[in-house]
Amino acid sequence: MANLGCWMLVLFVATWSDLGLCKKRPKPGGWNTGGSRYPGQGSPGGNRYPPQGGGGWGQPHGGGWGQPHGGGWGQPHGGGWGQPHGGGWGQGGGTHSQWNKPSKPKTNMKHMAGAAAAGAVVGGLGGYMLGSAMSRPIIHFGSDYEDRYYRENMHRYPNQVYYRPMDEYSNQNNFVHDCVNITIKQHTVTTTTKGENFTETDVKMMERVVEQMCITQYERESQAYYQRGSSMVLFSSPPVILLISFLIFLIVG
C-alpha cells in the first residue's frame, strides 16, 4: 500500500509540474506583441481575414462599415449588434443569448453513490433498509410437485429484502435471520391487504427464497464495507496525504 502511494505521488507530481509550467508560459497574440489579437489591424503578415466580394472598408456589398448586406454595425442581415438574422447580441443563434437562462441544478453524486450502496431507508420500520431488486433464485425442493409449484408461483414471492446495516450484527447468521423475518412479515402483510393469502407451502418456499436473497445481500454489504475500509486506509496513508496537500498547493497557487 505504501509503495502504491509513493508511485501515485511521483506520477501526480510529474504531471502537475508540467501543467504548472504550461500555465506560466506567455500566450501569443497578447497586447503589444507581434501577433495581433484583432485581425486586420496592423499585423505584420497582412490581414488574416480580407474583405470578400471586392468591397473595401466602408464600401457597400462587401462587409462595409455601417453598410447593409455585409455585417455592418447595427444593420440587419449580417450579424449586426443586437439585430436579427446574424447571431447578434441577445438574438437567436448567438452565444450570448444564453446569459439570462437559469443554470440547471447539479446532482450531488456523493449522495447518489451513498444511497445506491446502502439502500433506501424505509420509513416506519425502525432503520431497516430496502435492498435492490434481485432475480429470484432457482431452488429445488426435493419433489416434482414443489418444484413445479415454485416455478408457477415464484412471481408472488419477494424480490427485495429488508435489512439493517451489517455492522449492527455480530455474524452472518444473525443478519440473515433478522432479514428473513422482517422481509416475510412485510411481504405477507402487504399482500394480505390486497386480498391474497399464502398457504403453508407458500410460506415454506418464501423462507427458502428469502434466505438465499438475504445471504446475497449480506455478501454485497460485506464487499461494500470492505471497500469503504480500504479507501479510508488508502487516503489516510502519509504519501497520499502529502500528494493531496501538494495538489491543493498547485491549484491554489
From Swiss-Prot:
One of its GO terms (cellular component) is postsynapse. Coiled coil: none annotated. The normal, monomeric form, PRPN(C), has a mainly alpha-helical structure. Misfolding of this form produces a disease-associated, protease-resistant form, PRPN (Sc), accompanied by a large increase of the beta-sheet content and formation of amyloid fibrils. These fibrils consist of a cross-beta spine, formed by a steric zipper of superposed beta-strands. Disease mutations may favor intermolecular contacts via short beta strands, and may thereby trigger oligomerization. Its main location: membrane. Residues 23-230 are annotated as: Interaction with GRB2, ERI3 and SYN1. Its primary physiological function is unclear. May play a role in neuronal development and synaptic plasticity. May be required for neuronal myelin sheath maintenance. May promote myelin homeostasis through acting as an agonist for ADGRG6 receptor. May play a role in iron uptake and iron homeostasis. Soluble oligomers are toxic to cultured neuroblastoma cells and induce apoptosis (in vitro). Association with GPC1 (via its heparan sulfate chains) targets PRNP to lipid rafts. Also provides Cu(2+) or Zn(2+) for the ascorbate-mediated GPC1 deaminase degradation of its heparan sulfate side chains. Keywords: Amyloid, Amyloidosis, Cell cycle, Cell membrane, Copper, Disease variant, Disulfide bond, Glycoprotein, Golgi apparatus, GPI-anchor, Growth arrest, Lipoprotein, Membrane, Metal-binding, Prion, Repeat, Signal, Zinc. Cu(2+) 3 binds at residues 77-79. Cu(2+) 2 binds at residues 69-71. This is Major prion protein. The gene is PRNP. Belongs to the prion family. The glycosylation pattern (the amount of mono-, di- and non-glycosylated forms or glycoforms) seems to differ in normal and CJD prion. Changing residue 183 to A: In SENF and early-onset dementia; induces loss of glycosylation at N-181. It is a lipid-anchor; GPI-anchor. Residues 51-91 are annotated as: 5 X 8 AA tandem repeats of P-H-G-G-G-W-G-Q. SUPFAM superfamilies: Prion-like. This protein is produced by a bicistronic gene which also produces the alternative prion protein/AltPrP (AC F7VJQ1) from an overlapping reading frame. One of its GO terms (molecular function) is aspartic-type endopeptidase inhibitor activity.
